Amino acid sequence: MHKFYIYIILVFLALMPRVSASGQELRLPVVPDTLCAPHERAAYVVEHFWDNMCFADTALSHNREWMEQNFVNFLSVMPHAPAEAVDSAFANLLRHAGTNEGAIAVVYELAEQYLNEWQSPMYNQDFFISFLSAAVAEPSLGALYGDRSRYLLEVAQKNRPGNIATDFAFVQADGSEHTLHQWLKRPTLLVLYSADCDHCRKVIEQLKQHAALAAAVEQGTVNVLAVCIDDDMALWRSQLATMPKQWTVGFDGGKIMDNESYELSDLPAIYLLDADCRVRIKELHDLSALNDEKLRKML
């Protein structure tokens, strides 16, 4: 059944019209008949997706609407292709587009929008890392995009799922000092927040009302560690009474921000860690992932 859906997607992409304002089309590559397996055909499509694109034609390559539609189609095949094909596909795209400054600006903007913004339906950190790795390796992009790619790649690779979460120190209200690795004994929802952040307060309130999480905490199967990453201890202390007594609430004095040890582009930053301090979910945005069944499977 899975192979059937891959086949349908490839057929759909092959048949759908792709007409620009100038009436020209971006033709899909013709997959060789010798490639029969769906993943092989998907790999061929993504690797050769842009072969028929002339990036020197600025009526097309600078046309954001036209490029966006084709870029979305390009991304839609990637989940069905092997990882090495995805890497190759991004490298090919950037090699072609990198010769045109306006074109690479459009491509880069689309990659950030669709792959790195969590609100995007195509949000995918693995694909974004693949894109950034290809951008770092592509000499034609120049210093501007090369430097930005290196920075974003470093950020994206921090605390990836499967890796041990970066250690940090924090203090509790009673003055006791801990480190994450020393303190953590069981699966933990780590919440990094700012005391001066309205959105943080809203999300923390949602977590306080989350029935499955509250039950797991009550049963002792999950801990919640909420750490204020500001340097204003007085403000942090003034809000302690609003935090659930079953949670561990800490203060780090701004060191996580200073050290840039966690990605903090969107606060609160929420991570689900297992009992070995490995990241199971990075930057949890959808609280439905904390329902009973998913918690049991992940932890």
Annotate the PLM regions:
Residues 1-26:
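Bacterial Sec-dependent N-terminal signal peptides
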Residues 21-173:
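Oxidative protein folding and maturation machinery
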Residues 178-209, 223-225:
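Short active-site neighborhood of thiol/selenol oxidoreductases, capturing the structured segment around
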Residues 204-241, 254-259:
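Structural microenvironment flanking redox-active thiols in thiol-disulfide oxidoreductases
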Residues 240-275:
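Short, internal strand/loop/helix patches
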Residues 269-299:
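Thiol-/selenol-based redox modules, centered on thioredoxin-like
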